[in-house]
């Protein structure tokens, strides 16, 4: 045993001298990002619906490719489309379907995730208990947001003696959320929606929270607080009475964000107002932009659920990947 130890020590000493004589050293771990040739800046604008998810994707992508930077701004789906088609940004975030006339201008849309719009009311609404028990039918929403036939909260829940006036809030910026809500309320367009125009998703929610008689609509990630897995404090997601049985069934009442996400994923929540969210480029994406979009559709999908979004069905995800490739 002693002979073996001496021999081993002698061998190690010889190796050490050899390395020293050659001026070599054992290399340490490579710094993060070393050898990474991917670099550049990606500019993105558009839908508030996709904004939180996009910022998360950008953060995670930068951990892998630290020499890539991002400039991300909101502004609504309309701005995202205009900016993408004009070449003002590399990627436009668009929370609605791409129109034929936009495709004719070079808009190239790729679906990346699924989201939905939900009706929101103030938590202190005078008939909140009735709303949560009965739900609100699609026809009632049409009469509130489109025709204006229903103007009091008593009419909503079948109690005409309650005369509190409904205060309707809608989006003032061109956006996918409004377009999807308009499609749900009678296959209409954003400009057909009644109400006081408020800018952006957070703006509508804030208006509803400050007004006990208010009603609006918000994307999933704004209607719910992901940290608490519940509607944002001061607001309630009004159940949609889809089967018109005058009661909010368990598959229509979403007390938690998880329940709402499951309903969107399984198709129990109607589409519209559920829909895919898209990234739009001018022509088929290339270079760094394409690399980022392909990453979103592959490794980037692992962050979708924890960010409060719903993954596309596998077949649609594969279709998007093939389209972006």
Write out the residue ranges for each language-model feature.
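Sec-dependent N-terminal signal peptides of Gram-negative exported proteins
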Residues: 9-15
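Exported/periplasmic ABC-transporter solute-binding proteins
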Residues: 23-85, 94-98, 103, 110-111, ...
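Bacterial N-terminal signal peptides that target proteins for export
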Residues: 1-9
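Structural motif
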Residues: 116-118
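C-terminal motif of bacterial Sec signal peptides marking the signal peptidase cleavage site
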Residues: 16-21
């Amino acid at each position: 045993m002693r002979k073996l130890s001496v021999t081993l020590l002698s061998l190690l000493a010889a190796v050490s001298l050899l390395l020293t004589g050659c001026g070599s050293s054992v290399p340490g771990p490579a710094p993060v990002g070393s050898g990474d040739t991917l670099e550049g800046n990606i500019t993105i604008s558009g839908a508030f619906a996709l904004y939180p998810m996009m910022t998360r994707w950008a953060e995670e992508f930068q951990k892998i490719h630290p020499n890539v930077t991002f400039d991300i701004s909101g502004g609504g789906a309309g701005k995202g489309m205009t900016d993408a088609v004009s070449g003002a940004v590399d990627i436009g975030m668009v929370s609605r379907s791409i129109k034929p006339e936009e495709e004719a201008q070079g808009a190239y849309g790729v679906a990346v995730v699924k989201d939905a719009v939900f009706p929101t009311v103030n938590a202190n609404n005078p008939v909140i208990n009735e709303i949560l028990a009965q739900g609100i039918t699609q026809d009632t929403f049409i009469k509130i947001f489109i025709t204006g036939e229903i103007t009091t909260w008593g009419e909503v829940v079948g109690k005409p003696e309650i005369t509190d006036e409904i205060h309707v809030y809608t989006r003032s910026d061109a956006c996918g959320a409004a377009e999807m809500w308009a499609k749900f309320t009678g296959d209409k367009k954003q400009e057909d929606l009644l109400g006081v125009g408020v800018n952006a998703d957070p703006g509508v929610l804030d208006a509803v929270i400050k007004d006990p008689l208010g009603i609006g609509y918000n994307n999933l990630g704004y209607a719910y607080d992901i940290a608490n897995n519940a509607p944002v404090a001061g607001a309630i997601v009004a159940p949609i009475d889809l089967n018109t049985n005058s009661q909010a069934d368990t598959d229509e009442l979403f007390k938690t964000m998880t329940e709402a996400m499951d309903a969107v994923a399984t198709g129990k929540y109607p589409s519209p107002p559920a829909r895919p969210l898209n990234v739009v480029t001018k022509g088929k994406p290339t270079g760094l932009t394409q690399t980022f979009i392909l990453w979103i559709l592959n490794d980037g999908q692992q962050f979708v659920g924890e960010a409060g979004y719903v993954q596309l069905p596998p077949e649609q995800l594969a279709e998007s990947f093939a389209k972006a490739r």
